[in-house]
Amino acid sequence: MSDTGSTATKAKTAAIVSGYFSPLHVGHLDMIEGAAELADEVFVIVNNNAQQEIKKGKVIIDEADRLRVVLSLQAVDHAIVAIDEDRTVSASLAQLAETFTDYSLIFANGGDRIPDFVPEAATCEEHGIELVFGVGGNEKADSSSRINVELGLEDAQSAPPSATT
């Protein structure tokens, strides 16, 4: 049985954000700063190299470098590289919930995520993690894929349609 807890019974609240951060851009900063407004602390899951290969076809910026950049941000209290082997961060969310049992956790999603399809929803429900949407704004401020396509680091065919417009 999982401990779903409530904000009233936990000592602290942490908002969890996830992303590739390859490269980090203003939309990521908006999301992280928005998460900081929701909770006492901000935890970041940096998608791993295998996930980057699944999404983009190659590693553009190594996971250790992306983690280091994220950890340097003033608003970030804790960051990990994802342990997942697919494009979700379900296993990483479960790991954080099992590690930080004294926290009420929020999975903060940016403007490009919608409640209708969140692959991590079942994990959040199982571990009592609240889902929040529109963190940092309801519109996507920028796209790592757009930046990478313009720099010639990512093929336009592999990028999501919104990244090339």
Predicted regions and their residues:
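Nucleotidyltransferase catalytic core that binds NTPs
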Residues: 1-165
